[in-house]
Amino acid sequence: MADKIAVLLGGTSAERDVSLNSGAAVLAGLREGGIDAHPVDPQEVDVAQLKAMGFQKVFIALHGRGGEDGTLQGMLELLGLPYTGSGVMASALSMDKLRSKLLWQGAGLPVAPWVALTRAEFEKGLSEEQKARISALGLPLIVKPSREGSSVGMTKVVEENALQGALSLAFQHDDEILIEKWLCGPEFTVAIVGEEILPSIRIQPAGTFYDYEAKYLSDETQYFCPAGLEASQEAALQSLVLQAWKALGCTGWGRIDVMLDSDGQFYLLEANTSPGMTSHSLVPMAARQAGMSFSQLVVRILELAD
Protein backbone atom coordinates (compact mmCIF):
# COMPACT_ATOMS: atom_id res chain seq x y z
CA MET A 1 0.00 0.00 0.00
CA ALA A 2 1.30 3.48 -0.92
CA ASP A 3 2.28 5.83 1.88
CA LYS A 4 -0.35 8.30 3.04
CA ILE A 5 1.22 11.77 2.95
CA ALA A 6 0.21 14.79 5.05
CA VAL A 7 0.80 18.16 3.39
CA LEU A 8 1.01 20.67 6.24
CA LEU A 9 -0.24 24.07 5.12
CA GLY A 10 -1.63 27.27 6.60
CA GLY A 11 -0.61 27.24 10.23
CA THR A 12 -0.64 30.20 12.59
CA SER A 13 2.35 32.33 11.56
CA ALA A 14 2.35 35.74 9.86
CA GLU A 15 2.94 33.83 6.61
CA ARG A 16 -0.29 31.79 6.80
CA ASP A 17 -1.75 33.07 3.52
CA VAL A 18 1.43 32.31 1.59
CA SER A 19 1.55 28.84 3.15
CA LEU A 20 -2.04 28.09 2.12
CA ASN A 21 -1.09 28.90 -1.48
CA SER A 22 2.14 26.89 -1.28
CA GLY A 23 0.36 23.92 0.25
CA ALA A 24 -2.38 23.90 -2.38
CA ALA A 25 0.22 23.87 -5.16
CA VAL A 26 2.27 21.13 -3.46
CA LEU A 27 -0.85 19.03 -2.89
CA ALA A 28 -1.82 19.26 -6.57
CA GLY A 29 1.73 18.48 -7.69
CA LEU A 30 2.03 15.42 -5.46
CA ARG A 31 -1.34 14.09 -6.59
CA GLU A 32 -0.33 14.63 -10.21
CA GLY A 33 2.71 12.48 -9.41
CA GLY A 34 0.50 9.68 -8.12
CA ILE A 35 1.06 10.38 -4.41
CA ASP A 36 -1.73 9.78 -1.87
CA ALA A 37 -1.50 13.30 -0.39
CA HIS A 38 -3.93 15.04 1.98
CA PRO A 39 -4.06 18.65 3.27
CA VAL A 40 -3.64 19.23 7.01
CA ASP A 41 -3.87 22.71 8.55
CA PRO A 42 -2.25 22.85 12.02
CA GLN A 43 -4.61 25.71 12.90
CA GLU A 44 -7.48 23.24 12.67
CA VAL A 45 -5.88 19.84 13.34
CA ASP A 46 -3.63 18.71 16.20
CA VAL A 47 -0.46 17.65 14.37
CA ALA A 48 0.49 15.45 17.33
CA GLN A 49 -2.24 13.12 16.01
CA LEU A 50 -0.75 12.73 12.51
CA LYS A 51 0.57 9.23 13.13
CA ALA A 52 -2.70 8.15 14.74
CA MET A 53 -4.48 9.52 11.65
CA GLY A 54 -2.57 7.03 9.51
CA PHE A 55 0.02 9.29 7.89
CA GLN A 56 3.43 7.80 7.06
CA LYS A 57 5.27 10.93 5.84
CA VAL A 58 4.90 14.70 6.07
CA PHE A 59 5.50 17.35 3.42
CA ILE A 60 6.01 20.63 5.28
CA ALA A 61 4.56 23.54 3.28
CA LEU A 62 4.40 25.82 6.33
CA HIS A 63 6.36 29.08 6.45
CA GLY A 64 7.56 31.06 9.43
CA ARG A 65 7.18 30.25 13.11
CA GLY A 66 5.76 26.90 14.02
CA GLY A 67 6.59 25.60 10.56
CA GLU A 68 10.24 26.14 9.70
CA ASP A 69 11.79 27.12 13.04
CA GLY A 70 12.54 23.62 14.35
CA THR A 71 9.55 23.28 16.69
CA LEU A 72 7.40 21.27 14.29
CA GLN A 73 10.43 19.27 13.21
CA GLY A 74 11.05 18.31 16.84
CA MET A 75 7.48 17.09 17.23
CA LEU A 76 7.71 15.01 14.05
CA GLU A 77 10.99 13.51 15.29
CA LEU A 78 9.25 12.48 18.52
CA LEU A 79 6.38 10.97 16.51
CA GLY A 80 8.85 9.08 14.33
CA LEU A 81 7.40 10.56 11.13
CA PRO A 82 9.77 11.33 8.23
CA TYR A 83 9.40 14.91 6.98
CA THR A 84 10.69 17.12 4.19
CA GLY A 85 13.42 19.69 4.62
CA SER A 86 16.05 20.30 7.28
CA GLY A 87 16.18 18.89 10.78
CA VAL A 88 15.54 20.59 14.12
CA MET A 89 18.84 22.43 14.58
CA ALA A 90 19.30 23.60 10.98
CA SER A 91 15.68 24.77 10.81
CA ALA A 92 16.02 26.77 14.03
CA LEU A 93 19.33 28.33 12.98
CA SER A 94 18.08 29.23 9.50
CA MET A 95 14.94 30.89 10.88
CA ASP A 96 17.11 33.05 13.15
CA LYS A 97 18.86 35.60 10.91
CA LEU A 98 21.16 36.78 13.70
CA ARG A 99 22.44 33.30 14.59
CA SER A 100 22.81 32.47 10.89
CA LYS A 101 24.99 35.54 10.41
CA LEU A 102 27.07 34.78 13.49
CA LEU A 103 27.65 31.22 12.31
CA TRP A 104 28.50 32.27 8.76
CA GLN A 105 30.80 35.00 10.02
CA GLY A 106 32.55 32.47 12.24
CA ALA A 107 33.02 30.22 9.22
CA GLY A 108 34.68 33.08 7.34
CA LEU A 109 31.77 33.62 4.94
CA PRO A 110 30.78 37.15 3.82
CA VAL A 111 27.81 38.85 5.50
CA ALA A 112 26.71 42.50 5.53
CA PRO A 113 27.80 44.57 8.56
CA TRP A 114 25.04 44.70 11.17
CA VAL A 115 23.96 45.71 14.66
CA ALA A 116 21.60 43.50 16.70
CA LEU A 117 19.17 44.93 19.26
CA THR A 118 16.89 43.30 21.82
CA ARG A 119 13.50 44.67 22.82
CA ALA A 120 14.82 45.36 26.35
CA GLU A 121 17.69 47.46 24.95
CA PHE A 122 15.29 49.38 22.71
CA GLU A 123 12.82 50.11 25.52
CA LYS A 124 15.60 51.21 27.89
CA GLY A 125 17.03 53.53 25.26
CA LEU A 126 20.06 52.98 23.07
CA SER A 127 23.48 53.58 24.58
CA GLU A 128 25.90 56.02 22.96
CA GLU A 129 27.99 53.04 21.84
CA GLN A 130 24.99 51.42 20.13
CA LYS A 131 24.07 54.70 18.43
CA ALA A 132 27.65 55.05 17.20
CA ARG A 133 27.69 51.50 15.82
CA ILE A 134 24.40 52.08 13.98
CA SER A 135 25.66 55.41 12.64
CA ALA A 136 28.83 53.72 11.38
CA LEU A 137 26.70 51.50 9.12
CA GLY A 138 25.73 54.59 7.14
CA LEU A 139 22.51 55.11 5.18
CA PRO A 140 20.42 53.54 3.78
CA LEU A 141 19.84 50.77 6.33
CA ILE A 142 17.60 47.72 6.33
CA VAL A 143 15.81 46.89 9.60
CA LYS A 144 14.34 43.42 10.03
CA PRO A 145 13.04 41.05 12.73
CA SER A 146 15.52 38.26 13.37
CA ARG A 147 12.93 35.48 13.17
CA GLU A 148 10.39 36.32 10.49
CA GLY A 149 10.21 35.40 6.83
CA SER A 150 8.68 36.84 3.64
CA SER A 151 10.08 40.30 4.54
CA VAL A 152 7.45 40.67 7.29
CA GLY A 153 8.27 43.66 9.52
CA MET A 154 11.15 44.78 7.30
CA THR A 155 11.86 48.44 6.43
CA LYS A 156 14.40 50.25 4.29
CA VAL A 157 15.55 53.36 6.17
CA VAL A 158 16.89 56.18 4.00
CA GLU A 159 16.72 59.03 6.53
CA GLU A 160 17.89 58.97 10.15
CA ASN A 161 14.55 60.27 11.47
CA ALA A 162 12.78 57.19 10.06
CA LEU A 163 14.86 54.74 12.10
CA GLN A 164 12.72 54.85 15.25
CA GLY A 165 9.57 53.91 13.34
CA ALA A 166 11.38 51.08 11.56
CA LEU A 167 12.64 49.70 14.88
CA SER A 168 9.15 49.89 16.40
CA LEU A 169 7.68 47.98 13.44
CA ALA A 170 10.32 45.25 13.59
CA PHE A 171 9.81 44.83 17.34
CA GLN A 172 6.10 44.17 16.69
CA HIS A 173 7.24 40.87 15.17
CA ASP A 174 10.20 39.77 17.30
CA ASP A 175 12.09 40.43 20.53
CA GLU A 176 15.37 40.66 18.62
CA ILE A 177 16.06 42.61 15.45
CA LEU A 178 18.84 43.32 12.98
CA ILE A 179 19.95 46.67 11.58
CA GLU A 180 22.05 46.01 8.49
CA LYS A 181 24.07 48.07 6.07
CA TRP A 182 22.14 48.45 2.81
CA LEU A 183 23.72 46.51 -0.04
CA CYS A 184 22.97 48.22 -3.33
CA GLY A 185 23.61 45.52 -5.90
CA PRO A 186 21.23 42.93 -7.37
CA GLU A 187 19.76 40.11 -5.27
CA PHE A 188 20.17 36.46 -6.20
CA THR A 189 18.71 33.28 -4.83
CA VAL A 190 20.04 29.75 -5.23
CA ALA A 191 17.95 26.65 -4.56
CA ILE A 192 19.28 23.28 -3.46
CA VAL A 193 17.39 20.00 -3.85
CA GLY A 194 19.22 17.01 -2.42
CA GLU A 195 22.77 17.23 -3.73
CA GLU A 196 21.78 19.32 -6.76
CA ILE A 197 22.38 23.07 -6.86
CA LEU A 198 19.81 24.60 -9.21
CA PRO A 199 20.52 27.55 -11.53
CA SER A 200 20.65 30.90 -9.75
CA ILE A 201 17.89 33.49 -10.15
CA ARG A 202 18.41 37.26 -10.28
CA ILE A 203 15.59 39.24 -8.69
CA GLN A 204 14.64 42.71 -9.89
CA PRO A 205 11.78 44.24 -7.87
CA ALA A 206 9.95 47.26 -9.26
CA GLY A 207 10.26 49.06 -5.91
CA THR A 208 13.24 49.81 -3.71
CA PHE A 209 13.63 46.29 -2.35
CA TYR A 210 12.23 42.77 -2.47
CA ASP A 211 9.48 43.15 0.16
CA TYR A 212 6.30 41.14 0.86
CA GLU A 213 4.35 42.82 -1.94
CA ALA A 214 7.14 42.25 -4.47
CA LYS A 215 7.41 38.60 -3.42
CA TYR A 216 3.76 37.59 -3.48
CA LEU A 217 1.48 40.28 -4.92
CA SER A 218 3.26 42.27 -7.59
CA ASP A 219 3.37 41.24 -11.24
CA GLU A 220 6.06 43.86 -11.84
CA THR A 221 8.86 42.00 -10.05
CA GLN A 222 11.18 40.52 -12.67
CA TYR A 223 13.08 37.25 -12.32
CA PHE A 224 15.97 36.21 -14.53
CA CYS A 225 16.93 32.54 -14.74
CA PRO A 226 19.61 32.05 -15.97
CA ALA A 227 20.71 35.02 -13.90
CA GLY A 228 23.06 36.44 -16.54
CA LEU A 229 26.22 35.91 -14.51
CA GLU A 230 29.52 35.00 -16.11
CA ALA A 231 30.44 31.33 -15.66
CA SER A 232 33.09 32.20 -13.06
CA GLN A 233 30.61 34.32 -11.07
CA GLU A 234 27.96 31.58 -11.18
CA ALA A 235 30.52 29.05 -9.95
CA ALA A 236 31.61 31.39 -7.14
CA LEU A 237 27.99 31.99 -6.14
CA GLN A 238 27.17 28.28 -6.08
CA SER A 239 30.30 27.53 -4.05
CA LEU A 240 29.40 30.21 -1.48
CA VAL A 241 25.82 28.97 -1.22
CA LEU A 242 26.94 25.38 -0.70
CA GLN A 243 29.33 26.45 2.08
CA ALA A 244 26.54 28.45 3.75
CA TRP A 245 24.11 25.52 3.42
CA LYS A 246 26.56 23.06 4.98
CA ALA A 247 27.58 25.47 7.76
CA LEU A 248 23.95 25.59 8.96
CA GLY A 249 23.59 21.81 8.64
CA CYS A 250 20.72 22.08 6.14
CA THR A 251 19.43 19.01 4.32
CA GLY A 252 16.70 18.03 1.88
CA TRP A 253 15.83 21.20 0.04
CA GLY A 254 15.83 24.96 0.49
CA ARG A 255 17.15 28.26 -0.74
CA ILE A 256 19.92 30.71 0.11
CA ASP A 257 19.49 34.42 -0.67
CA VAL A 258 22.54 36.48 -1.63
CA MET A 259 23.33 40.09 -2.60
CA LEU A 260 25.99 41.19 -5.07
CA ASP A 261 27.23 44.55 -3.81
CA SER A 262 28.66 47.34 -5.94
CA ASP A 263 32.15 46.14 -4.94
CA GLY A 264 31.54 42.89 -6.86
CA GLN A 265 31.39 40.83 -3.66
CA PHE A 266 28.62 38.35 -2.87
CA TYR A 267 27.12 38.67 0.64
CA LEU A 268 24.90 36.07 2.30
CA LEU A 269 21.46 37.32 3.36
CA GLU A 270 19.51 34.38 4.77
CA ALA A 271 18.57 30.73 4.41
CA ASN A 272 15.07 29.44 3.72
CA THR A 273 14.45 25.84 4.74
CA SER A 274 10.78 25.80 3.68
CA PRO A 275 10.61 28.20 0.73
CA GLY A 276 7.44 29.38 -0.94
CA MET A 277 5.89 27.17 -3.60
CA THR A 278 3.35 29.63 -5.03
CA SER A 279 2.98 30.83 -8.62
CA HIS A 280 5.52 33.58 -7.84
CA SER A 281 7.96 31.24 -6.09
CA LEU A 282 11.59 30.81 -6.97
CA VAL A 283 12.49 27.17 -6.35
CA PRO A 284 9.96 25.94 -8.97
CA MET A 285 11.35 28.55 -11.40
CA ALA A 286 14.92 27.29 -10.94
CA ALA A 287 13.72 23.68 -11.22
CA ARG A 288 12.03 24.46 -14.55
CA GLN A 289 15.30 25.89 -15.84
CA ALA A 290 16.97 22.62 -14.81
CA GLY A 291 14.35 20.63 -16.75
CA MET A 292 12.22 19.58 -13.79
CA SER A 293 8.42 20.01 -13.76
CA PHE A 294 6.64 21.20 -10.61
CA SER A 295 5.24 17.72 -10.00
CA GLN A 296 8.68 16.14 -10.43
CA LEU A 297 10.11 18.72 -8.03
CA VAL A 298 7.66 18.07 -5.18
CA VAL A 299 7.89 14.29 -5.63
CA ARG A 300 11.69 14.56 -5.49
CA ILE A 301 11.52 16.68 -2.31
CA LEU A 302 9.22 14.07 -0.76
CA GLU A 303 11.65 11.29 -1.70
CA LEU A 304 14.36 13.12 0.26
CA ALA A 305 12.23 13.13 3.45
CA ASP A 306 13.76 11.29 6.40
UniProtKB/Swiss-Prot annotation:
InterPro entries on file: ATP-grasp, ATP_grasp_subdomain_1, D-Ala_lig_Van_CS, D_ala_D_ala, Dala_Dala_lig_C, Dala_Dala_lig_N, PreATP-grasp_dom_sf
Q: How is the cofactor bound?
A: Binds 2 magnesium or manganese ions per subunit.
Q: Where is the ATP-grasp domain?
A: 101-303
Record-listed Mg(2+) 2 binding positions: E270, N272
Biological-process GO terms, alphabetical: cell wall organization; peptidoglycan biosynthetic process; regulation of cell shape
**Listed GO cellular component terms?**
cytosol
What Pfam families does the entry give?
Dala_Dala_lig_C (PF07478), Dala_Dala_lig_N (PF01820)
Q: Where does Mg(2+) 1 bind?
A: D257, E270
Q: Does the keyword field hold Amino-acid biosynthesis?
A: no
Q: Identify the SUPFAM superfamilies for this entry.
A: Glutathione synthetase ATP-binding domain-like (SSF56059), PreATP-grasp domain (SSF52440)
Q: Which GO terms describe its molecular function?
A: ATP binding; D-alanine-D-alanine ligase activity; metal ion binding
**What cofactor does this protein call for?**
Mg(2+); Mn(2+)
Q: What class of enzyme is it?
A: ligase
- What keywords does the record list, in alphabetical order? ATP-binding, Cell shape, Cell wall biogenesis/degradation, Cytoplasm, Ligase, Magnesium, Manganese, Metal-binding, Nucleotide-binding, Peptidoglycan synthesis
Q: Which reaction does it catalyse?
A: 2 D-alanine + ATP = D-alanyl-D-alanine + ADP + phosphate + H(+)
Enzyme Commission designation? 6.3.2.4
Where along the chain is ATP bound? 134-189
Its annotated pathway reads: Cell wall biogenesis; peptidoglycan biosynthesis
Which top-level group of life is the source organism from? Answer: Bacteria
Q: What does this protein do?
A: Cell wall formation.
Q: Which family does it belong to?
A: Belongs to the D-alanine--D-alanine ligase family.
**Subunit:** Monomer.
What the entry lists under NCBIfam families is as follows: D_ala_D_alaTIGR (TIGR01205), PRK01372.1 (NF002378)
The protein's name: D-alanine--D-alanine ligase B
Q: Which organism is it from?
A: Salmonella typhi
